[in-house]
């Protein structure tokens, strides 16, 4: 299969002068289209930093990162924004829902903000509501939902545009064990049935095992 993510000799530091912190030090890895990869490592090992670099949320780094055949570091802002909108869905530990919008409007928000009409998105919305088990909650407000349900809304929002890649940063970090299992089963379903490539950062071995492969970060380098 084609490599959809390629990271080559990437280094990243924070701070200046005597306070420089080397988070990544020549990290290299690749993810093939259709894989479900878990990125693991000790706290502070640079897992989330690497995920953010891959997603183009931070472009100050040394080395090369390619996503969907495009060099993240050389893209202009508009081209990077277009790449993210078309090919990437982001899921974070915190759900970041708009509390005065109902479930379906939260899911639609990124697409409508980029000029899509709700009528154009109806079929995709109905499908993703069914996949995420939120059909009966489409008119519910976020404050009436459990943490697991709110994270499902966040996932639905991330995948409504049918991205090639889901980048998930500790997506179950705030959830109980039952909700964690439900969310991980949902990711597996999106990977196996929708063919979405998933790269998740997790500290949980149990969550990592839902994926097809584990990459570990040690001393700023990737192993495995």
List the predicted regions and their residue ranges:
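ABC family nucleotide-binding domain
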Residues: 3-214
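H-loop (His-switch) and adjacent beta-strand-loop-beta switch element
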Residues: 214-224
